[in-house]
């Protein structure tokens, strides 16, 4: 039976119940926290990457914004590990679900906006009306800026969903083409297989880049409101 092209994006269920929550928790179960101090190359590289990313992401923030550093680092590690685990064969990637990405984007965006209105009310309200706007354009610009503000979490979620989904679809299509060409032309099948390997390597990079971009945009929203 031929598998539907989008079958891998359907949320799996067990006995009629969704098991997305278990899949989301899987990275933490796969990499448990050691009970004693372990210092090896893997841990050293992991700590170096976390420190480097944290330093770059937190450099623009004031003291109030830097209190979000633990949450932002946890976010980038969660999205990155979820994306990479989703590249394994016969696995499911939760970040291909727009509902899940909206579930991450909307609360984070709402928290940054709430922080801005709580601590910098005048500055936050000033974002709705750029300085030097002609009086005739004030009503239209306020509406446009309000719409652009509420589009931010949607764009954040759609960007992550689209990039991860597109990569998985390309791998699925090229993999299917490689299998189909094995019985037709071995040389062409070898070329498509080489393309598949290169695309898989690219998808590993995209998985990490999209995690960084998602977290960086949340960090920039926070910077605008602190």
Swiss-Prot record:
Q: What is its main location?
A: mitochondrion
**What stretches pass through the bilayer?**
6-26, 68-88, 97-117, 136-156, 164-184, 189-209
- Membrane listed as a keyword: yes
Quickly give the catalysed reaction: H(+)(in) = H(+)(out)
One matching Pfam family is ATP-synt_A
User: A GO biological process this protein is involved in?
Assistant: proton motive force-driven ATP synthesis
Keywords, A to Z, come to: ATP synthesis, CF(0), Hydrogen ion transport, Ion transport, Membrane, Mitochondrion, Mitochondrion inner membrane, Transmembrane, Transmembrane helix, Transport
Highest taxon in the source lineage: Eukaryota
KW Repeat (keyword) present: no
Function of this protein?
A: Subunit a, of the mitochondrial membrane ATP synthase complex (F(1)F(0) ATP synthase or Complex V) that produces ATP from ADP in the presence of a proton gradient across the membrane which is generated by electron transport complexes of the respiratory chain. ATP synthase complex consist of a soluble F(1) head domain - the catalytic core - and a membrane F(1) domain - the membrane proton channel. These two domains are linked by a central stalk rotating inside the F(1) region and a stationary peripheral stalk.
| Record's subunit section | Component of the ATP synthase complex composed at least of ATP5F1A/subunit alpha, ATP5F1B/subunit beta, ATP5MC1/subunit c (homooctomer), MT-ATP6/subunit a, MT-ATP8/subunit 8, ATP5ME/subunit e, ATP5MF/subunit f, ATP5MG/subunit g, ATP5MK/subunit k, ATP5MJ/subunit j, ATP5F1C/subunit gamma, ATP5F1D/subunit delta, ATP5F1E/subunit epsilon, ATP5PF/subunit F6, ATP5PB/subunit b, ATP5PD/subunit d, ATP5PO/subunit OSCP.
Name of the molecule in the record = ATP synthase F(0) complex subunit a
> What is the organism of origin for this protein?
Sus scrofa
Its taxonomic path starts at: Eukaryota, Metazoa, Chordata, Craniata, Vertebrata
């Amino acid at each position: 039976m031929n598998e539907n092209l989008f079958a891998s994006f359907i949320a799996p269920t067990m006995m009629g119940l969704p098991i997305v929550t278990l899949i989301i928790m899987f990275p933490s179960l796969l990499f448990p926290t050691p009970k004693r101090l372990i210092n090896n190359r893997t841990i050293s590289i992991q700590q170096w990457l976390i420190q480097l990313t944290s330093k770059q992401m937190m450099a623009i923030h004031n003291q109030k914004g830097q209190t979000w550093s633990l949450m932002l680092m946890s976010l980038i590690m969660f999205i990155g590990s979820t994306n990479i685990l989703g590249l394994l064969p016969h696995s499911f990637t939760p970040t291909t679900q727009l509902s899940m990405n909206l579930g991450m984007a909307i609360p984070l965006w709402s928290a940054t906006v709430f922080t801005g209105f709580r601590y910098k009310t005048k500055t936050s309200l000033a974002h709705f009306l750029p300085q030097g706007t002609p009086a005739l354009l004030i009503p239209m610009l306020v509406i446009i800026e309000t719409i652009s503000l509420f589009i931010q979490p949607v764009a954040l979620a759609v960007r992550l969903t689209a990039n991860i989904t597109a990569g998985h679809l390309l791998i699925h299509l090229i993999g299917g083409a490689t299998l189909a060409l094995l019985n037709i032309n071995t040389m062409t099948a070898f070329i498509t297989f080489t393309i598949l390997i290169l695309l898989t390597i690219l998808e590993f990079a995209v998985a990490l880049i999209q995690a960084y971009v998602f977290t960086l945009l949340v960090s920039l929203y926070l910077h605008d409101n602190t």
